[in-house]
Design a protein with these regions (language model features):
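Small cysteine-rich, disulfide-bonded extracellular modules of the LU/uPAR three-finger superfamily
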Residues: 1-74, 81-118
């Protein structure tokens, strides 16, 4: 059975409402489907409401150097509302090349796209 366009748009809207926590960490391993959190949580932001384009959710999140540890960050995840310290219901996680040290007055911007496919 295929989820139709209207269904994927509705699922995207449910995700938008319920998954507004974005957390960063400095873990490096690949993401497994059974994963429930970041490898090494460092900071999170709540109330991060994505924009929906069709059935794609787009999160634009900024972290300042003061929010990023000296070890840098190399993983980011989207969590269900109510998540604390990167432990909760994980929607999606990705790893990337470590940012390295970020000056406290600088900002690192992330754009995360989550596609609800049919």
């Amino acid at each position: 059975m295929t989820v139709v366009n209207e269904g994927t748009a509705d699922i995207a809207d449910l995700i938008k409402t319920n998954y507004q926590v974005v957390a960063i960490g400095d873990g490096r391993d690949t993401t497994s489907a059974s994963q429930t959190g970041l490898n090494n949580f460092t900071f999170q932001k709540t109330g991060q409401v994505p924009t929906i384009v069709g059935s794609t959710l787009i999160y634009n999140v900024d972290f300042t150097g003061a929010q990023i540890p000296a070890s840098g960050v190399s993983e980011i995840g989207i969590f269900k509302n109510g998540t604390t310290n990167g432990n909760g219901t994980l929607l999606s996680r990705v790893t990337f090349t470590n940012t390295g040290v970020v000056a406290s007055g600088d900002t690192v911007s992330f754009t995360i796209r989550v596609e609800v496919d049919n």
